[in-house]
Amino acid sequence: MSIKVTQEKLPASRVGLQIEVSGEQSRQVYERTLTRLSREVRFPGFRPGKVPRPVLIQRLGETALKANAIEDLVQQSLESAIAQESIPAIGNYQLSSDFETLVAAFQPGESFSFEASVDVQPTATLAQYTGLTVEVAEVPFDANRVDNVLAEQQKQMATLVPVEGRNAAIGDVAVIDFQGILVESGEEIPGGSGTDFQIEVEEDRFIPGFISGIVGMAIEETRTVDATFPETYAQEEVAGKAAQFTITLKELKTRDLPELDDAFAQEASQYETIEELKTALTERFQAEHESEVKASKRDAILTALADQLDVEIPESLLQREISAMINETASRLSGQGMDVRKLFTEEVLERLRENSKDEAEQRLRRTIALGELAKVTETQVDDEAVKARAAELLSNYPRPQEIDRDRLNTVVREELLEDKLLEWFEANNSVTFVAPKAAETEVDAASATVETTATETAEEAPEAPKAKKGKKKA
């Protein structure tokens, strides 16, 4: 289809198109539309494809026929215009002309003009990619982590024995009955009651005031305890509100901890001695720390690159990235056993899309910045390197025949290219580690991610954590 096309550059990586179609082409499309509809519609007394044209026009109406023809003509004309002008289009087009006006003006056999716009691949430039100074927040290594993990494992493997001759203290395990009300209204708290409820008497295990109210109680004692739900509590109907709990202490237990010896190691893990277990934990935590350091450095470098990027991200690309983020979150939550169909209601999805815009844009800016760095530095990945890495990954997978090899090669190539680009950046810029700022360690409630926004709808009413049993393999 030969057509006349006038292009206009629009903001946000869009191109406006003024398209003119000849009278002969408008006639041909109209005729094809009538032929298609005559095959598709079903009228009593006529076989499919045998509906006479006058009957078709009378039954459907001239306006409806023109509207169908224009839809076909616009779609075909846009596809031809994009191909003819070599426009790097992404996403769907948007009709700028008023559709009803087009229908009223359309005459088969006469020239037809309309305006539309389409998103295109963004043009990006890096203002600077050498000589930059990048500060990376240090990731401290917790030297006590092995001891803390073993201590927690001791608790899980401990034997609970009844407490005699004293009142409840921090570190105990209590069995309680409790019932809560909101002070202001006197109404019962949804989910705020329980019978024979086992709770660890540990600070910060429940809402402020609850645990401190249990401390000092005697068995069979009943107390009224004042507590307050945090302002940031997941259930909005009780967040920030004062509550009263009537608590009866029915049983009190303490933990008889096992010794940290070889027998402990054999029961808690696949290792024969406690020293082997400690060594394995140390090596694992050191490897995790190295990964965290690498991730911190990657994040800082990509942020620095994105800050140097000049680009207008098209809306269709942004929405596509948001959809990808939501799908990733849905996949993770589904893997955790959550019913995402119930979780992702229409209201939740709308909120997710809105809350995800900033993160999606930053992800796109990082991806585009890396792509531009690869162009200007002419960095590529050797096919043999991709093949070797893919083979290594497949060797560690129990069912390699189930893996999509093309997809695997694509992912491997992207990862190897990113590694090479990050190495190049480090060699040509100043990348230094600095102590993390205090503000960076605080939780910013306003910056909710896709996953936190999604999962907060699944939060239940306050529930005290129960004492854990069983063993955990190291």
Swiss-Prot record:
One of its GO terms (molecular function) is protein folding chaperone. Residues 441-474 are annotated as: Disordered. It is found in: Cytoplasm. Residues 444-456 have a biased composition (Low complexity). It catalyses: [protein]-peptidylproline (omega=180) = [protein]-peptidylproline (omega=0). Its main location: cytoplasm. HAMAP family: Trigger_factor_Tig. NCBIfam families: tig. Consists of 3 domains; the N-terminus binds the ribosome, the middle domain has PPIase activity, while the C-terminus has intrinsic chaperone activity on its own. This is Trigger factor. It comes from Synechococcus elongatus (strain ATCC 33912 / PCC 7942 / FACHB-805) (Anacystis nidulans R2). The gene is tig.
